[in-house]
Amino acid sequence: MKIAVTKFLGTNCDLDVCHAVKLAGGEPELVFFTQENLDSYKGAVIPGGFSYGDYLRAGAISARTPIIKGLKKMVEEGKPVLGICNGAQIGLEAGFSKGTLTNNLNAKFICKWVYIRVENNKTPFTQYYKKGEVLKIPIAHAEGRFYADDETLDYMYKNNMIVFKYCDETGEVTEEANPNGSIDNIAGVCNENQNCVLLMPHPERASEKILGSDDGLKMFKGMIDYAKRI
Amino acid sequence: MYKATVIIKLKKGVLNPEGRTIQRALNFLGFNNVKEVQTYKMIDIIMEGENEEKVKEEVEEMCKKLLANPVIHDYEIKVEKIE
């Protein structure tokens, strides 16, 4: 069960992601951004970091490198593709879902534990969660404010493309629980086919109890089990 | 040779936290008449081309493919001939 873990210049969460994929029973393999063909992999994770120093816009440069062609093909073929933090920014820049991620409302880098609520448990990554389940997972980003215009947002709700929302400990979606000013507290989205999930929080940093939470591990387990079936 | 200048700004209605933070700092300094601050990104591109129109077309393509994010950005392009 080989899973591609992409590496751009400035990716720094790749080894953490590899560890989480292994914990979930997968076989991670680091793949450099120059590789275009990803046919031998059953799924892919785009880890976080600061690819290309966030030059121009976070994820903008990475989204124009050769590996994007292979990732796009995977998304189109229905293979599970997960973008985390900078990986989510790259995925949205590459057009894998809709909307964009831009500067936090308080104009600061935010690094802290947050709670997110599962809005859609029909994706490979969220299949082992209950709808409405609250997960404790950390965030670490400066450009994580999700934005889409009203028409796009409407389309995304109609097509079940909203996967996670920031909430409080009890699962209430409140303004106080919104760390970065994301529209409707949105923390994670997916494509129409539901096989590509892009989220700002870091599930790999919440994949073992010793880290403070293992709420994120099921995302990788869901991914691996889904990949086995395709 | 031509110099194309691209000015990338946020679309109307998209919040600009950087501009808002600068505005607040100016207010702290006593410039209480400052009501809004917008920040832009400006990119100069030195390039070869047949004529100003062709250069502009090409830079427009660059904006669509990389320089601007159509979800949140508007952009302006100015082209001038240089030595």
Curated annotation (Swiss-Prot), chain A:
Key words of the record: ATP-binding, Cytoplasm, Glutamine amidotransferase, Hydrolase, Ligase, Nucleotide-binding, Purine biosynthesis
GO molecular function: ATP binding; glutaminase activity; phosphoribosylformylglycinamidine synthase activity
Cellular location(s): Cytoplasm
EC number: 6.3.5.3, 3.5.1.2
GO biological process terms held by the UniProt record: 'de novo' IMP biosynthetic process
Catalytic activity, reaction form: N(2)-formyl-N(1)-(5-phospho-beta-D-ribosyl)glycinamide + L-glutamine + ATP + H2O = 2-formamido-N(1)-(5-O-phospho-beta-D-ribosyl)acetamidine + L-glutamate + ADP + phosphate + H(+); L-glutamine + H2O = L-glutamate + NH4(+)
Pathway annotation: Purine metabolism; IMP biosynthesis via de novo pathway; 5-amino-1-(5-phospho-D-ribosyl)imidazole from N(2)-formyl-N(1)-(5-phospho-D-ribosyl)glycinamide: step 1/2
Highest taxon of the lineage: Archaea
GO cellular component assignments: cytoplasm
PROSITE patterns linked to this entry: GATASE_TYPE_1
Gene3D superfamilies, sorted: 3.40.50.880
Stored SUPFAM superfamilies: Class I glutamine amidotransferase-like (SSF52317)
Active site positions, chain numbering: C85, H202, E204
Glutamine amidotransferase type-1 domain mapped to chain residues: 2-230
Disulfide bonds: none
Subunit text: Part of the FGAM synthase complex composed of 1 PurL, 1 PurQ and 2 PurS subunits.
HAMAP family xref list: PurQ (MF_00421)
Function: Part of the phosphoribosylformylglycinamidine synthase complex involved in the purines biosynthetic pathway. Catalyzes the ATP-dependent conversion of formylglycinamide ribonucleotide (FGAR) and glutamine to yield formylglycinamidine ribonucleotide (FGAM) and glutamate. The FGAM synthase complex is composed of three subunits. PurQ produces an ammonia molecule by converting glutamine to glutamate. PurL transfers the ammonia molecule to FGAR to form FGAM in an ATP-dependent manner.
Protein name: Phosphoribosylformylglycinamidine synthase subunit PurQ
From Swiss-Prot, chain B:
Presence of the UniProt keyword ATP-binding in the record: yes
Pathway the protein acts in: Purine metabolism; IMP biosynthesis via de novo pathway; 5-amino-1-(5-phospho-D-ribosyl)imidazole from N(2)-formyl-N(1)-(5-phospho-D-ribosyl)glycinamide: step 1/2
Subcellular location as annotated: Cytoplasm
Quaternary structure annotation from Swiss-Prot or TrEMBL: Homodimer. Part of the FGAM synthase complex composed of 1 PurL, 1 PurQ and 2 PurS subunits.
Entry keyword annotation includes ATP-binding: yes
Enzyme Commission designation: 6.3.5.3
Protein name: Phosphoribosylformylglycinamidine synthase subunit PurS
InterPro entries reported in the protein's UniProt record: PurS, PurS-like_sf
Summary of the function given for this chain in its UniProt record: Part of the phosphoribosylformylglycinamidine synthase complex involved in the purines biosynthetic pathway. Catalyzes the ATP-dependent conversion of formylglycinamide ribonucleotide (FGAR) and glutamine to yield formylglycinamidine ribonucleotide (FGAM) and glutamate. The FGAM synthase complex is composed of three subunits. PurQ produces an ammonia molecule by converting glutamine to glutamate. PurL transfers the ammonia molecule to FGAR to form FGAM in an ATP-dependent manner.
Gene: purS
GO molecular function, one term: phosphoribosylformylglycinamidine synthase activity
SUPFAM superfamilies: PurS-like
Similarity remark: Belongs to the PurS family.
Entry GO terms, CC: cytoplasm
Gene Ontology annotations of biological process type: 'de novo' IMP biosynthetic process
Organism annotation: Methanocaldococcus jannaschii (strain ATCC 43067 / DSM 2661 / JAL-1 / JCM 10045 / NBRC 100440)
Keywords tagged on the record: ATP-binding, Cytoplasm, Ligase, Nucleotide-binding, Purine biosynthesis
Catalyses which reaction(s): N(2)-formyl-N(1)-(5-phospho-beta-D-ribosyl)glycinamide + L-glutamine + ATP + H2O = 2-formamido-N(1)-(5-O-phospho-beta-D-ribosyl)acetamidine + L-glutamate + ADP + phosphate + H(+)
Family matches, as Pfam families: PurS
